[in-house]
Design a protein with these regions (language model features):
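Juxtacatalytic substrate-recognition/specificity segment
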Residues: 1-116, 120-122, 139, 215
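Acidic/His/Gly-enriched intrinsically disordered linker/tail segments
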Residues: 63-66, 80-85, 93, 98-196, ...
Length: 233
């Protein structure tokens, strides 16, 4: 393992060279990734899984850690896969720490905290904001890929408009973007129209008013005069 001030990198011995590079990358980007949410995350364990055909990564609070599946995806952007994972998953760490506050890392409580946060904030916010980070802070990112916006662009040019719920949750019948592209465009619109600190303001308000129905939507309404459906439309 590699220990820095901010990360504990856990990896197979055979993967040490790449683990060193991941550690250096994370240390380099942590300030920029956390800046717009005004939250420097606590130290976290990063587990590198190199014996898998899955190309993915995740952050969880029970127990608090992030795992990188290091096999590159066949269809992704032109950037190094581990660099993309570092920025995207680190943004999730910052998001969770922003909302969990002093309860982050507390045994037992953290297990339920993740479920509570996902009730408070819809998936399109988590993922759209993280895609925005990887796009803004790297030379590529999914926000620059034509294939990423394919469904949105096709429907728009065809004069097809679906509801917020359908675009978010998807359809077995019609082509819809899903919550990654939806979230990217909605969070980008928020930053473009209300400044880079708008998500910080909204998430802070969510944190101060826990367990409210439609918490994210109501917090958005406070700062933008629009709930999530109005923002989508």
């Amino acid at each position: 393992q590699i220990n820095t001030n901010n990360f504990q990198i856990i990896y197979p011995v055979s993967f040490e060279t790449e683990a060193q590079r991941v550690a250096n990358t994370l240390q380099k980007v942590i300030v920029e990734v956390s800046k717009s949410l005004n939250k420097h995350p606590k130290k976290i364990s990063i587990i590198l899984q190199n014996q898998s055909v899955v190309s993915n990564g995740f952050v969880t609070l029970g127990p608090r850690r992030s795992e990188f599946y290091t096999t590159p995806a066949q269809e992704f952007d032109s950037q190094d896969w581990l660099n993309s994972l570092a920025v995207h998953e680190l943004r999730h760490v910052v998001q969770f720490d922003k909302l969990s506050g002093r309860f982050s890392g507390v045994p037992f409580i953290e297990t339920y905290l993740g479920a509570i946060l996902n009730l408070e904030v819809p998936s399109w916010v988590w993922e759209g904001d993280a895609v925005g980070a990887e796009t803004a802070l790297t030379t590529t990112g999914r926000g620059r890929l034509p294939s990423f916006e394919l469904a949105f662009r096709t429907n728009t040019l065809s004069g097809i408009r679906y509801s917020y719920v359908k675009n978010y949750l998807g359809s077995m019948k019609d082509m819809t973007p899903g919550y990654y592209p939806l979230g990217f465009f909605m969070t980008t619109k928020l930053r473009r129209d209300y400044g880079t600190g708008i998500l910080d303001s909204i998430m802070t308000h969510v944190k101060k008013n826990p367990f409210r129905p439609y918490n994210l939507s109501r917090s958005s309404k406070k700062y933008t005069k629009m709930n999530t459906r109005q923002l989508h439309d």
